[in-house]
């Protein structure tokens, strides 16, 4: 009797937990049979004859065995259903993670001081199944860190090529870290717009590891950043890095700025229009301060934008300044456009673009080959040379008044006589030297002439370069005149030596029979 009641309780509990309709029908039929059996047992009770007791006991035993077999079948069906659900869940997870292979993510890495997340690349799905902290089955992913900071995170180059002779436990480098799929996070791409002074960054060194440092200055035009590396083990602590060799780190200030921006947005929606205008003013001041800071770290050209308006009536730079442009920054709302103006170019008339490109390639790819500024400077140099030649021509020209002064008034005769006496004295002095001495003197004077011509070329370049400085032009003109006089003297000496050498050669030919 007690066994039947216990079995009835078990069947009722199974009915409460059963989800399948077929199982519920079987359990309900079994429950009805047990209730009928209990009712019959209570009615018959002690009235059953003695000879029927063994037969009734056999029926109860058979009923108990049948009940136990049905319970075992129900437990087996429930366990098989659970196993099927787990296999289906794992298959879905593997399909999901297999589709993620090749994608970038942020994966955890266990350091001595704790767990830290680093950017990584998913390269495969492990076969082993693990149980996460919440007691749910999960698969493990194999990831390679893209910004390794320690040697155990550095990917093995031989493993990537499939030639590593060591297994994962013996190799000093990483064959891929195993992390659970539920622990990965979204990939954090580098934001180079956040680069500013004292910003912490990771910098890539020749050892293929990313070392921590702080920004000293940034050149957004050439995309180069100077970083001071942390630690004392670097011989050159301050180095220049390209943007692709840097990874800006997120600071607490950035998180505070994001939170404050969200709070300011919510407050702007709740506050009045006056408060909204004040917030906009604050944002404008912050933007202007950032633009000024950007101008300090931007490449400075040799000439500021709009400097030519000093000599013209142009007002373009003034209008840009009225519209909010800050001198020293690039064009555009964020100040990251070009800093130097685009130079005007004039292409040859009647020539195709292909022909113009061929001309530029013939000039070794000179970008300023068709520049208007270069053509104007070339024309100025030609005009300057023509003016110099005209000045020399006019200075050497002898007019009527000079002829009368030199020939009629007398001092000219004495001057000519003095020059003739000087020439005769120099000729007599040259006749006293040997031919070898004359040859050595000729070589020395030729070297002096070449040196003097180089000096004159340098002075001429200085004149062209400093055309705007009047006082410097005067000093350079004096130097040029002095060099010209010395060059004329050297050339006269060279002519005298050449004449003497030619005279000696002629005499030698006359004495040969």
Swiss-Prot record:
<keyword id="KW-0479">Metal-binding</keyword>
<feature type="zinc finger region" description="C3H1-type">
    <location>
        <begin position="155"/>
        <end position="178"/>
    </location>
</feature>
<dbReference type="GO" id="GO:0000122">
    <property type="term" value="P:negative regulation of transcription by RNA polymerase II"/>
</dbReference>
<dbReference type="InterPro" id="IPR000571">
    <property type="entry name" value="Znf_CCCH"/>
</dbReference>
<feature type="compositionally biased region" description="Low complexity">
    <location>
        <begin position="262"/>
        <end position="271"/>
    </location>
</feature>
<dbReference type="Pfam" id="PF01585">
    <property type="entry name" value="G-patch"/>
</dbReference>
<keyword id="KW-0863">Zinc-finger</keyword>
<dbReference type="GO" id="GO:0001227">
    <property type="term" value="F:DNA-binding transcription repressor activity, RNA polymerase II-specific"/>
</dbReference>
<keyword id="KW-0238">DNA-binding</keyword>
<dbReference type="InterPro" id="IPR000467">
    <property type="entry name" value="G_patch_dom"/>
</dbReference>
<dbReference type="GO" id="GO:0008270">
    <property type="term" value="F:zinc ion binding"/>
</dbReference>
<feature type="compositionally biased region" description="Acidic residues">
    <location>
        <begin position="272"/>
        <end position="283"/>
    </location>
</feature>
<feature type="compositionally biased region" description="Basic and acidic residues">
    <location>
        <begin position="496"/>
        <end position="513"/>
    </location>
</feature>
<protein>
    <recommendedName>
        <fullName>Zinc finger CCCH-type with G patch domain-containing protein</fullName>
    </recommendedName>
</protein>
<keyword id="KW-0805">Transcription regulation</keyword>
<dbReference type="GO" id="GO:0005634">
    <property type="term" value="C:nucleus"/>
</dbReference>
<feature type="region of interest" description="Disordered">
    <location>
        <begin position="252"/>
        <end position="283"/>
    </location>
</feature>
<feature type="region of interest" description="Disordered">
    <location>
        <begin position="478"/>
        <end position="513"/>
    </location>
</feature>
<feature type="domain" description="G-patch">
    <location>
        <begin position="312"/>
        <end position="358"/>
    </location>
</feature>
<feature type="compositionally biased region" description="Acidic residues">
    <location>
        <begin position="252"/>
        <end position="261"/>
    </location>
</feature>
<comment type="function">
    <text>Transcription repressor.</text>
</comment>
<keyword id="KW-0678">Repressor</keyword>
<keyword id="KW-0862">Zinc</keyword>
<keyword id="KW-0539">Nucleus</keyword>
<keyword id="KW-0804">Transcription</keyword>
<dbReference type="GO" id="GO:0000978">
    <property type="term" value="F:RNA polymerase II cis-regulatory region sequence-specific DNA binding"/>
</dbReference>
<feature type="compositionally biased region" description="Polar residues">
    <location>
        <begin position="478"/>
        <end position="495"/>
    </location>
</feature>
């Amino acid at each position: 009797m007690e066994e039947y009641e216990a079995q009835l309780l078990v069947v009722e509990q199974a009915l409460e937990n059963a989800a399948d309709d077929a199982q519920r029908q079987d359990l309900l039929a079994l429950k009805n049979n047990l209730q009928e059996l209990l009712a019959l047992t209570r009615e018959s009770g002690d009235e059953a004859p003695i000879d029927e007791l063994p037969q009734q006991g056999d029926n109860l035993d058979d009923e108990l065995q049948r009940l136990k077999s049905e319970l075992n079948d129900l437990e087996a069906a429930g366990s098989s259903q659970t196993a099927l659900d787990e296999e289906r869940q794992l298959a879905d997870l593997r399909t999901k993670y297999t589709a993620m292979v090749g994608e970038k993510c942020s994966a955890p890495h266990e350091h001595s001081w704790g767990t830290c997340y680093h950017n990584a690349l998913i390269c495969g799905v492990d076969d082993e199944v693990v149980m996460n902290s919440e007691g749910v089955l999960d698969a493990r992913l194999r990831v390679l860190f893209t910004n390794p900071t320690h040697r155990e995170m550095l990917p093995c180059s031989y493993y990537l090529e499939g030639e590593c002779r060591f297994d994962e436990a013996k190799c000093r480098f990483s064959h891929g870290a195993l992390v659970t799929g539920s622990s990965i996070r979204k990939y954090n791409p580098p934001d180079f717009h956040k680069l500013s002074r004292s910003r912490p960054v990771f910098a890539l060194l020749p050892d293929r590891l990313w070392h921590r440092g702080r920004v000293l200055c940034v050149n957004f035009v050439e995309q180069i950043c100077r970083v001071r590396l942390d630690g004392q083990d670097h011989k050159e602590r301050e180095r220049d890095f390209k943007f692709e060799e840097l990874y800006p780190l997120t600071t607490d200030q950035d998180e505070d700025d994001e939170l404050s921006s969200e709070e300011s947005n919510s407050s702007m929606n709740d506050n009045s229009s006056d408060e909204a205008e004040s917030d906009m003013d604050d944002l404008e001041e912050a933007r202007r301060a950032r633009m000024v800071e950007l101008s300090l770290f931007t490449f400075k050209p040799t000439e500021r934008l709009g400097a030519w308006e000093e000599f013209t009536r142009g007002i373009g730079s003034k209008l840009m300044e009225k519209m909010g442009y800050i001198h020293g920054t690039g064009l555009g709302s964020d100040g990251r456009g070009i800093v130097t103006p685009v130079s005007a170019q004039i292409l040859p008339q009647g020539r195709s673009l292909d022909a113009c490109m061929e001309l530029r390639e013939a000039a070794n790819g000179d970008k300023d080959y068709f520049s208007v500024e270069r053509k104007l400077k070339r024309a100025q140099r030609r005009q300057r040379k023509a003016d110099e030649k005209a000045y020399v021509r006019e200075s050497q020209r002898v007019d009527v008044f000079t002829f009368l002064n030199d020939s009629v008034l007398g001092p000219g005769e004495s001057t000519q006589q003095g020059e003739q006496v000087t020439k005769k004295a120099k000729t007599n002095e040259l006749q006293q030297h040997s031919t070898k001495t004359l040859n050595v003197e000729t070589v020395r004077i030729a070297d002096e002439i070449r040196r003097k011509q180089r000096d004159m070329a340098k002075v001429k370049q200085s004149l062209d370069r400093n055309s705007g400085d009047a006082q410097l032009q005067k000093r350079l003109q004096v130097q040029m005149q002095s060099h010209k006089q010395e060059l004329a003297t050297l050339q006269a000496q060279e002519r005298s030596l050449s004449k003497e050498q030619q005279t000696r050669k002629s005499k030698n030919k006359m004495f040969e029979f």
